[in-house]
C-alpha cells in the first residue's frame, strides 16, 4: 500500500476525453469470444498480498478457476488503467479508502455490491467498521461500493534503540526539523505518502488546497528533507538500514513497512504515530484502509463477489493479514473466530498493543487537491539531492 514509484498524475482529478475514448475503444475491440461467460476466470488488480499464492491457490482449487492478480504500488496508476480501457480486463480492484467513494463510483469505473448480501460481513468486523461504514459507501449512503480488510497507521518508523517511542511520539514530525538529525534517517520511496509526510513536517494538513506561503514552505522542506536523508529506498532497504543501525528512523512508514522486520525478531523496529500534528483536531498521524470493489466490467466474472466473500472468512482473512511480503491487521479481527488464529508473535509483529490508540490519533488517507503541484516540487527536490 505504500512503496510507490514516481508516476505522473497530471490532471488526475479530471477524467480526460482521451481516456474516455480509450474505454470505448477497448470495449469495441474486445474479441467476440472474450464476451463469453467468465465463470472460471477472475482478474484482480491489487496491492501486494492479494496476489500471493497463499491467498489465491485455495480459491483456484475450490473453483477450478484461472485467477490472475497483478500487484501495483500506486492507487492512481491502477485507476488510470481502468480509465484507459482495462475496465474490460479486471474484475476486482483493491485500493485505499477515498478512491471508491470519491473517484471510481462517480466515474462509473466500479459497480455497487448487493448490500443485503455483503453488508452483514461488516457486523463481524472491528467496531470502527460498523455498517454503514463511510468509506465503503457512496455519498448518498445507499450503495455499498466495496469491502474492507487490511488497514493501519502509517506515519513513520523508528529504531527504539536509537529513538525511544516516547520521544518519537512527543516530537513527531519535528524529528525532521532538528538539524542534528541530518543523515540519521531514510526516506521510503512512496510518492503520495512522502507528499503527505513533507506537508506534516512543514506544519500543515496535506488534505486541503494550499496557499502560496504553504507551497513555498513545502518546497523548502522537501529540499531540506531529501538533502538530509542518509538513503532513499524500498521497504527492504529501510528495514535493513534500521536493523544495522545505519539510520535511526524513516519517513514514511507504519505497520505495512515495519512488520516484516518485527516478524524477523526485531521488536525495536516500531511504527510511531505522533501524539499531535497539523491535521484537523490536532491529529498527528495518517492511516489507510483498503477497499476492494467490483470493476464495472461489462462481462464481470461471477467469481468476483465470491472472492470477496472468500477473503472475509476467518481463516482466509488471517492468511491475507500475513500474506508474504507485508503483515497487517485486518478488519475481520473483530470476529473471535478470526482473532483466535493470530499468535502472540503475530500480534506483536503488527503492534496490536497500540493499534487502536494510534488509529484514534490518525486522520484517514484522503485526496490532496493540489497533489500534482506538490509532487512535481518534491520530485525536483529528490533529483536535486541525488545529484549532490
Predicted regions and their residues:
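N-terminal secretory signal peptides
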Residues: 1-11, 20, 32-33
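Early extracytoplasmic/lumenal segment of secretory-pathway proteins
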Residues: 35-103
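A structural signal for short loop-to-beta-strand junctions that line the ligand-binding cleft
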Residues: 88-93, 111-157
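Ligand-binding pocket segment of bilobal, Venus flytrap-like solute-binding proteins
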Residues: 102, 187-190, 194-199, 207-274
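Short helix-loop capping/hinge motifs at secondary-structure junctions, enriched
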Residues: 162-170, 204-209, 298-304
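Short loop->beta-strand "edge-of-pocket" segments that line small-molecule binding or catalytic clefts
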Residues: 174-191, 205-206
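Mature extracytoplasmic/periplasmic domains
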Residues: 290-358
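Conserved C-terminal helix/tail region of periplasmic/extracytoplasmic solute-binding proteins
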Residues: 349-388
